[in-house]
């Protein structure tokens, strides 16, 4: 995975965007979050995932072990550390260049994979998960521009034994959902999004990827962030899900990420009679 040198990010930015769009499809910021942030986030996720009763995905073939994968949703409502995570300045800089500087937050959730937990089917997140239902998407949809950027923040060691996410380098250049017949090729050719707790692994949501089985003796947890361009509907309803005090203390950036001032959809019958759109 291409590693970003944050001290020279401005000079690297064009290369980073190129790597995400037409290179391997993934980059990493090592040590993006300190040990205290990782510990805070992990404590919340362990507490919130004590029971395996939340919606999960891509586990259709693993019904007997699905209880070993646990999701925690709506993290902005569960601790200030997550407010900080979605506003990491270097991640924001990359995302602004990739999705436009009015991007917003699609989701911030966590995935906890217990020892013995299963992997997922190879899939894409573009802009969500369901492109296997191709008839639900526009004609000639293609990979020429991005509508999703994913960030994985490991809270435990991510390696081959613990089930670090696998991805197929360059697969974002051919926008389609992986077929069952692609799986042997995927597993033979895939690389791993390996990392240490506190890293930020950033990848193009069109890239074929999946969690792998956790064959270690410890949990493998991560915070999962989805960013979207301003015109894509967020996956999670942030404003309905967070307490008012989170909204009240939010920075202008966090307010935008949550959609506090999102103008659409709008009741134009009730809008003030003035010109609001146009260059003049």
Predicted feature residues:
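A structural signal for short, well-ordered beta-strand segments
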Residues: 108-110, 151-153, 223-227
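Residues that flank catalytic or metal-binding motifs in active/ligand-binding sites
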Residues: 78, 106, 147, 161-163, ...
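Non-heme Fe(II)/2-oxoglutarate
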Residues: 1-9, 200, 207-208, 212-280
